[in-house]
Amino acid sequence: MRSALAEVPSVRRPVRRAVRRWAATVSAGLLAAALISGCGGDEPYVAPTQVPSTDDLQPAAAATTLDALQRALRRDDADAASALGADDQMSALLGSIVESTTAAGLDDVTLRYITENGQVSPDGAWTATVAATWRVGGFEERAAHADVAFAFADDGKRIAHIGGGADVTPVWLGGTTDVRRTDDVVVIAATGTLPVASVLAEAQEALVVARRVLGARADRLVVEVPSSAAAMDAALGIDRGSYAGVAAITTGADGSTVPGRPVHVFLNPEVYGDLEPVPAQVVMSHEAVHALTDAPASGAEAWLLEGFADYVALRDVDLPRSRTAGQIAEQVRRDGVPDTLPTRADLDSQAPHVGAAYEAAWLVCVTLAEHFGEDALVRFYDAALGGADLERTLRGQLGWTIADLTAAWQDELISISTVGG
């Protein structure tokens, strides 16, 4: 889910179980004996080293290590967490994770060993899948759930790495972060990405913008900033490159769209960071509407979800229609008026004219608000979020059919294309 002003250049993959063969070392003594006896022309005897096997792993010890990390996180004990690191770098990261979870107010943090994934290194370290849960205390009632890859060393007594592979890598576990928390906004940003103070201010302004239309339900917002576009894909558990050109995505904190799960805004620093202040604020406000109304878990029409979010975000922005609807106006001048309202395929991030489609969806909601008022638009949106039949709701609440709405919207498109022509 993205804003019309966020330009687009536009289930979990199975883990590959790898079996590695390690080169054997040659016994110097045996080789010397062979040379002395005049057998140097034959292949020397090679004494194989022991190949690490999953039979040698210590999952019980790893589970105990996870329990210790979980206690450290719950007790805000950075020193105890650092002691679990396999090296200085990992020790520092584990300590910083404790500090970040404390600053963000994460609650219900659990880490449970599930199974090894078959990747064993020569020194006996291995990677396993760990079930993690967490929620932002005071903001969310239900916890997020994700499978996260942990690498263990020293017979499971130390943690060597967190994240990677096909599992989810939550931002708060994937590296050092900068955190800001107020009464209504939490920002968790990978260190060195976007200025946390600026993101916090934009998120707070997004609540103000949303409250003008949504009222008191525009109460709290959680924003996460992964270290890169690839890290955003990892945080959501999706294929690499899925949202490379997208400024922001709103979805479950664990990448899922399960109803009731915490919903967060994720910013792509490689795109969002290049936006000018006004477009950046529009994007943040747009995504905030999705989060505040739990839109990702809704089965409502995409044009309504995206169009309404842009309606709220652009409502009080002083931008001309040539800017907010310039792409769809040009498309109408070139190809004529679309026959139907924007489809989900039109609004897909990889669609060829997705920018124009978002503008078109916004104009559908503008059309409804201009004919029936903003309160009527909000009631219609809420009914659709609740699963109501769109045609029946439109007729019952507003006295229109989808055909009536489409015709009025087409008139709006003709009007803006003429003005811009």
Q: Can you name each region flagged by the protein language model?
A:
Residues 181-301, 331, 390:
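Juxtacatalytic substrate-recognition/specificity segment
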Residues 122-134:
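A short hydrophobic beta-strand element
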Residues 40-71, 75:
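Short, low-complexity N-terminal intrinsically disordered segments enriched in polar/charged residues
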Residues 42-43, 134-177:
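Short beta-strand edge/turn micro-motifs at domain boundaries
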Residues 252-257, 278-279, 295-421:
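Acidic/His/Gly-enriched intrinsically disordered linker/tail segments
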Residues 35-38:
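C-terminal motif of bacterial Sec signal peptides marking the signal peptidase cleavage site
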Residues 2-30, 203, 277-280:
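N-terminal export and membrane-targeting signals
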